[in-house]
Amino acid sequence: MDGLRETAAGSGKIGTTGRGIGPAYEDKVGRRAIRFGDLQDLDKLQGRLEKLVDYHNKILVHLYDAKPIPFEDVMDELRNHQGLFQKFHSGTQDLLRGWVKENKKIIFEGAQGSMLDIDHGTYPYVT
């Protein structure tokens, strides 16, 4: 997607790395992203992922006149790396519970801060 966007921009291109970081952030703030924790259960994720791939395929085909990405290719890629995802997944809840057991002080602010944060809030109800 990055490469196609750069080509379409012509002399106005920005020099992207072409690794999909920009489109990934667009999905994130557009509240359609797949998050790391979602990768724990690919069967449960499948419906949302189908919608996301369909969304991007419409852009690829209709805006850039490019070939669509087969959904099964995306699922196969995720299945091939699922062990890696599980290896690096850790729960914030477990971390917080540990701090509580250690009697550490924890401060939360939710009304205007953390709960609205795009990374740590009540996604997708974030700003």
Residue ranges and their predicted role:
Residues 1-127:
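Non-transmembrane, aqueous-exposed alpha-helical and coiled segments at domain scale
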